[in-house]
Amino acid sequence: MALICISPILIVVTIWLHFANKGAGAFFFQERPGKDGKIFKVIKFKSMTDERDADGNLLPDAQRLTKIGRFVRSTSIDELPQFINVLKGDMSLIGPRPLTPVYLKVFNERQARRHEVRPGITGWAQVHGRNHCKLSKKFEYDVWYVDHCSLIVDIKILWMTVINVLYRKDIGEGAGDMQDIDDLGFTPRILEIERKEREQNAK
């Protein structure tokens, strides 16, 4: 029902982004771990072009972010295609936000509990700081939700999400600077894991 209601918005934004992204497409697909760590492809609206420099390297994000892309991010419209993930059963409306698979390799046992439920479009951490929330606190919020999820909690999260979107509270143009919110020291470990994976794939 929700997907049917938002379908006019999806169609308009898809056409809008198709032209704004200069042929780079309107959708962005990325692998994310879901319930029990099962990998699925999350769908979002693509807010950047694929423009590259003379050497073939992608230009900085700030240069590739379009005006329309900035708008869909600041209004959280870029998240709407994830209702398709909900329809497919990969995600839920409410739950911990899905991160990239590399986090599975750095989580401790307690942090990994966030995967005991399906990831959500919005969640307890999103209505308590979103991109400005420190990682340690974000994961504590996620585990709290796992232990306390209920219809009443979900309704509360939905209501708080609507308020946050309307007042654009804790909503930015993109994810916060990871080094600003990473109080767990995950960033260097993740970068090292990704470097080794690139080297392995290059062989």
Whereabouts are the PLM-identified features?
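Soluble extracytoplasmic domains of inner/organellar membrane proteins
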Residues: V127, H132, D147-C149, W159-M160
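Short, glycine-rich, amphipathic interfacial segments at transmembrane boundaries or analogous
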Residues: G25-R64, T122-E140
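Short, hydrophobic secondary-structure boundary micro-motifs
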Residues: V13, F27-F28, N57, I94-P96, ...
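Positions in alpha-helical segments
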Residues: T14, F28, T66-R70, V102, ...
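Generic recognition of short, well-ordered alpha-helical interface segments
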Residues: S7, F40, Q63, D78, ...
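A short, structured surface patch at a secondary-structure boundary
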Residues: D61-R118, T161, V165
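Compositionally biased, charge-rich terminal segments
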Residues: S136-I152, G174
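A hydrophobic, helix-centered structural microdomain
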Residues: M1-D50, I157-K203
